[in-house]
């Protein structure tokens, strides 16, 4: 009986499971790759960030250097059939090494990593990765256009949502209607865009505003506001408490490249969403079918008022969104697209 040799895959990521992009765009695919006969070796750019202050100040910088060296060793001496690089940059020397060894590499990124005022050379680093990758995968049409300018025709795969983990939940009968937002300390600055409509609604309707992952010092006056830290294990429970999910975004070069993952999570949980008409939001949100788009204060007010007053509409839009999340954006659907790309290399 012939024993089938496993295909060696080196997976280089921007971080560990505590890094959202690495977890969503790469790490959650590892079991799927292994089921398809790949032996996956994961090397992150940085180690898990320690909570201890001394370790963070003294040992973490040393470990970061060691992990960079591990990437160098893996590329130069490892035996691989494919290298999957998520978001990070590798040197021209290492790119040439892969080419000389006839090892194809896939480059995946999901944000405008080339726009960083503090690191202006990121644009050239990103362009270099795009030019020499055997295949580039991006999350939005806007990132696709960036790659085309460097002669690369990428594939678009949205950030996959775990529809088996993030599911509709049974709401408590007497639970107060909850308008929710989930994000990060950095993106909580975008909440300024919806504060006035929410405050105006609070003068007329009874609801609570749940923020998950916002800055610890974020406050909004005149509203029943509940703030929770983002914890992966609590993600489904927190989203499940929401009746309406929000994604406000300013219209900038950087936000137009965002992947809309928050919307996909709301949809997976079966709740309607209201979002700014920026970037991929305009593709994901189908007004009147799975949510609404709102560009100005009055539109935010009107869309939210409509959803507050119409329970059946919330159920309908949420159900439609759940169906689309499973059919178009689930981890299984996205992995099938990714696998076909890799198998052709």
Positions of the model-derived regions?
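An aromatic- and histidine-rich active-site surface loop
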Residues: 14-18, 23, 83-102, 191
